[in-house]
């Protein structure tokens, strides 16, 4: 019986986005600023909706959940990267890597399904306004060239053939992504048909404008996901993968509260009341 030389991996090294010290300092400040903006922006959305009884409706319920998920999403990846920079280490344990990867996939899926439910909410509100309340009440319903443990760079570390793993991930990802995306598409097809029947141009514009924020978030979310996970590996570089991943793990959660509150008069009013209440209490 011949012996074989085997070794086990106990930790990985996260190489980050740059190895240049000057760039690392700049990236640290940039990601710290974006992370704080993400947490504060989404936290304000959650507080505004939870403390204002006028916003206790299905649309704002889903929005507050999306803000909470976005806050958790950024907290899964960015703090570890910032901590590694402060501590001067690039290591992440094997169990820590798997845990981070698990929560990234969990929160991406939650974002995915929340966007689909929000599209259905807009569909019911526009196409079936008289049944909206009845339908939407809760009574009826090694070295990783990356800055977090993403599955694509992790599979590249394997010494064995990973084609089957990649096929399974692509198939499962397609099923998870396609089902909500089809719901979103169907909702907006019905919305478009209903809006086009509105006689006045102003009425059509007002109806479409209620969906603008959601469409912007859907475009950002699905655009970056498709760019990262549904392109052939040979056609893109690790750097492009990393930058696309930064978009959906850091930039999109940061932009969501601004996108949703920018054109929403009720939400802006609730935010002003939250800020003024906190200011006077201090």
Set out the residue ranges of the language-model regions.
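Transmembrane helical core of 7TM receptor-like proteins
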Residues: 1-282
